[in-house]
Amino acid sequence: LDAPTIRAIVERALEGAAELVARPVRATVEPGENAILRVTLERPVPRAAEVVPDRARVTVRDDSGTPVFTGTVDLVGPREMRSGLVAVRADKALPPGLYHARVETPDAPWRPRSVTTGFWVRDAALLASGPRLTVSRDWIRRDGKVVPVIGTTYMASDVHRKFLFEPNPHVWDRDFADMRREGINLVRTGLWTAWSRIMLDPGAVDESFLSALDAYVLTAAKNGIPVCFNFYAFLPPAYGDENPYLGPRALEGQRALLTLVASRYRGVSWIHWDLINEPSYAPPSGVWSNLPIGDRHEAEAWRAWVKAKHGDDPLVLRDLWRDGSSDPLGVPRPDEIGYRFLRDERHPRKVRDFFEFTQDVVAAWAARLRGILREAAGSDTLVTLGQDEGGTGTRPAQQILADSLDYTAIHTWWNNDDLLWDGVVTKVPEKPDLHQETGLMSLEDIDGAPWRTPRSAEALLERKFADAFAARGAGVVEWAWNVNPYQPEDNEATIGFNRPDGTAKPERDVAGRFARFFAEAAPFLDDFEPDPVVLVIPHSRLFAGRPAGVDSTKRVVRLLGERYGVVPTALSELRLGAERLRAARLVIVPTPEMVTEDAARALLEASRRGTKVLVTGEVEGDPYGRPTPSLEALGLLAEGRPVTLHEPTGWGVPPGGRAWVTFDSLATQWLKRAPGESVRLDGNVWHEPLPLELAVETEPLVALLGAALEAAGVATNPAPAGVAARLLVAPRGVLAVCVNETPVDARRRMRVEGRAVDIPVPAQRSRLLLFERGTGRVLVATPGEPVTDARRGGP
């Protein structure tokens, strides 16, 4: 900083605390209605001889800068705080549009002496001008055209999460214009935990909030950016009831809030809806987990669910769940959740069913609220639910929720080792998956210094963006546009593109690069061809509390992407059907341990159509340990044994040779292998006896996957470890995505439209390229060295 700047900073500090605030009483007024502004001047510790202003000057201009009102406002009150209201009475009714009000106290002996706020005169034509948002298998579409989302989360850069209670449309318009210039094409915002501030009692909604939301939507529309609005966070409000998902009073209150808000925007396609942020099924004390709530509504719903699934014969249920208690139909106790070496009084098979029950409860709740929103806002309004990575575990899962939503969403925060997997297991083939709240938590070293440099943070965010598209995602919504310095938690108080001083982090460049790439690529994109490989998520194993849960799927996704340039479609075992497997050449079922009869039947039907099915590890039966007809027909049932620390395998060595794999982390105490030697890939059902996905060594699993891909006739792009890659084929273009997780620059070889090319990928960065169908010519590419022909070495 130069000397004058430092001097100005010191002088301002010596002036002491002072604040001039101006806000509209209602941020949106109707045509012909006068806007009212409240001006507040605070001087917490006035100096003895100084004169605190008792009047402020107000100038209102339209959006072109033309003055439409000038006046003054009397400020009354003690010297420490004075306030007043001014009505904007123009010579004639103000036409629809955004207006900017500058408030000045020029005689104040301190700074700031001026502030600018804004308000809207409702513009019905602008609200009605929105694009028609729809969804297809892979994309969110705008008036029918593919729009890869490059979005952000935005509340406000001045008051942040208080933005709908302390509105300033002038600031919003400045920030939205900045976003538009950067290429942002969707903004996510909402209430999160502030729902109680707008409606404590069902039906009694705060009109000032609605007026502010009108202004926010109008400002977004003025800048051509659609809004996704979130209602709740973590748990829905119970409104005095016992269960937020099942209680009638809870559902009544939720219906009232959603109806009162959404009906205001009937026919307004600039806004659509996100039901709840990162939900759990749990009591308030158990957020971020999946636990019984313990109320009567839950008990009744559980009994009805069990009766529909198994009947209500206590003898049958005792046998099914190994439950000898006096109340086999009772909800599992919280202390039954989780794995232990000794079963004690726990009933893991019953817990497995309870977890499936909670998934169904939340999915039904989401479907109910989606129906309410469609009745209120219109049948074509889009509805999603922003779940975090807990949806890949036992919390409400995107794979199960998908039928209740228009598109799924995943918040990619913590799983930095498995970012591609995050997207794969949360995307269903029928609907788009949007990566929301993609950002970086803070990390510190032993002395509290930042773990990442600004440039390494930028590189990680770039990999997150690229992995979203590699996972067939519909786009990325970054968290958040502005750093929120008011956050009391250090972990969150530094997240965002733009710092409180107005400067931008290098991370912001990521959004611009991807926005520019997809602006050129979008006309060539459409829904992609189905993936030839399907990965089955063993949800029964996860819900039964088995160690390592679905970790086997992480290893498969990483190795397929890095070593073979193949990324699978993932399907939940609980939603597996033969029709969903119709396009698959290869179905991988990694270490399932137990498989429902419905899923086994789908696998059997697929195998009889010619699809190859690869299953690893022991399969004991269905989730209740019973043999089933389809498992018998697949030839998967055979009594196995616990793995030993070292097991022999024929994979990864020459024919007739033997390698050894290691099962550590006490796997010898909870993991079994099937009998027999390494599988021969004959027929259509292949059962590898070893759960190789959970072994320490990688190469045997790489060899097994490679042999399975070859036998199934799946095209691959083999490469050493470290750079994940895939090709996504649309009718007019082929999207290539490469992500380098190594510290060295690399060249990833891919065969595109018959042309072998080497794609340069910088260390810890990514490359996206769009190739023309038929010719393999590069149409668009993210910045980097040129692609070269692998045979000739030329561009």
Model-derived segments and their meaning:
Residues L37-E42, P46-D74, G84, Y99-E104, ...:
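Beta-strand-rich binding/interaction modules
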Residues V171-Y239, P248-L260, A366-A376, M594:
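Aromatic-lined substrate-binding rim segments of carbohydrate-active enzymes
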Residues A256-L257, A366-L382, Q399-Y486:
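Catalytic-core region of carbohydrate-active enzymes that cleave or remodel glycosidic bonds
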